[in-house]
From Swiss-Prot:
Residues annotated for ATP binding in this entry: G96, S97, V98, A99, V100, G101, K102, S103
Predominant localisation class: cytoplasm
Family named by the database record: Belongs to the prokaryotic pantothenate kinase family.
Reaction(s) catalysed (UniProt annotation): (R)-pantothenate + ATP = (R)-4'-phosphopantothenate + ADP + H(+)
Gene that encodes the chain: coaA
Organism: Coxiella burnetii (strain RSA 331 / Henzerling II)
CDD domains reported in the protein's UniProt record: PanK
InterPro entries linked: P-loop_NTPase, PanK, PRK/URK
GO process terms (BP): coenzyme A biosynthetic process
SUPFAM superfamilies membership: P-loop containing nucleoside triphosphate hydrolases
Record-given protein name: Pantothenate kinase
Keyword field: ATP-binding, Coenzyme A biosynthesis, Cytoplasm, Kinase, Nucleotide-binding, Transferase
Pfam families to which the protein is assigned, alphabetical: PRK (PF00485)
EC number in record: 2.7.1.33
Length: 318
């Protein structure tokens, strides 16, 4: 186990390089094939079986211990209360910048966790569904702040998380379309008492100043049983973001119904410049102000290199 130079002796994290972390796999079986992985890839990020074996299988093993421990604690609580134990999902929060690979991480984890021996039901929810509609953002002058905390319907997200964590059935999740860059009015996904919920979002580790006891403020992270932050250097994420926009420009943006179809009238150089501008003026600002400052609230940090591979893992010890 190595020590990161810039972290002092009272760091709350244990740090592991790739080889050290991979050793924690032990005898956890690899349940994914190359064919399975093909369905899980991101727009620009390719996850190899080697990455799954060395990084995600040990993480899956760790989570299996954590979920079991949480279930035992929950059983003890309801035994003490003398009440029947409800079915309450284990909630995992995955945070990080735009284009850092949160969705790919969520998909790989879902695939692995759902293949545990007891075959748990795993659902992935993204906070995109809780963005205000473009019409409302336009009215409030927030279109250029899309993805910032104020662009989300936080009361609705908190109500949904409370319902899920209370064991309610058939909880409705609003649907967001990246193709139309907007909420799909009247369309919902249903979450019906899964065993595990993965919540993926930009600002989900963010907190503020809590109010008085009479006005106790609740944060998204209050509902998490485990939280994970996907990290990389800002200049590296910028390149990934530009590459992703160019990839969409060559494919989905060609659809006349796509919100960004107008970009297909530009050259590749112009689109790259557009993406860089959006990164610098919006996404980087959000990262520095609302995402990165809360990285150390996560229980586990995955640190990526420029080739998308995870090179270091930080596990909270306290």
């Amino acid at each position: 186990m190595t020590v990161k130079p810039e972290l002092n002796e009272i760091t709350p994290y244990l740090q592991f390089n790739r080889q050290e972390w991979g050793n924690f796999r032990k005898d956890t079986p690899l349940t994914l094939t190359e064919s399975d992985l093909d369905k899980l890839q991101g727009q620009i990020e390719i996850v190899s079986l080697k990455e799954v074996t060395e990084i995600y299988l040990p993480l899956s093993r760790l989570l299996s211990f954590y979920v079991t421990a949480r279930q035992t604690l929950q059983q003890a609580t309801y035994q003490f209360l003398g009440k029947p134990e409800p079915k309450v999902p284990y909630i995992i929060g995955i945070a990080g910048s735009v284009a850092v690979g949160k969705s790919t991480t969520s998909r790989v984890l879902k695939a692995l966790l759902s293949r545990w021996p007891d075959h748990p039901n795993v659902e992935v929810i993204t906070t995109d569904g809780f963005l205000y509609s473009n019409a409302k953002l336009e009215k409030q002058g927030l279109m250029k702040r899309k993805g910032f905390p104020e662009s989300y319907d936080m009361p609705s997200l908190l109500r949904v998380l409370n319902a899920i964590k209370s064991g309610q059935r058939n909880v409705r999740i609003p649907v967001y379309s990246h193709h139309y860059y907007d909420i799909v009015r009247g369309q919902y996904e249903i979450v019906d008492q899964p065993d595990i919920v993965i919540l993926e979002g930009l600002n989900i580790l963010q907190t503020g100043v809590r109010k008085t006891l009479q006005q106790l403020q609740v944060f998204v992270s209050d509902f998490f049983d485990f939280s994970l932050f996907v990290d990389a250097q800002a200049q590296v994420i910028q390149k990934w973001y530009i590459d992703r926009v160019l990839s969409f420009w060559r494919t989905t943006f060609k659809d006349p119904h796509s919100y960004f179809h107008y970009l297909t009238q530009m050259s590749e150089t112009e689109v790259a410049a557009f993406a860089k501008h959006v990164w610098n003026e919006i996404n980087k600002v959000n990262l520095m102000e609302n995402i990165l400052p809360y990285k150390n609230r996560a229980q586990l940090i995955l640190e990526k290199a420029a080739d998308h591979s995870i090179q270091k893992v930080y596990l909270r010890k306290i």
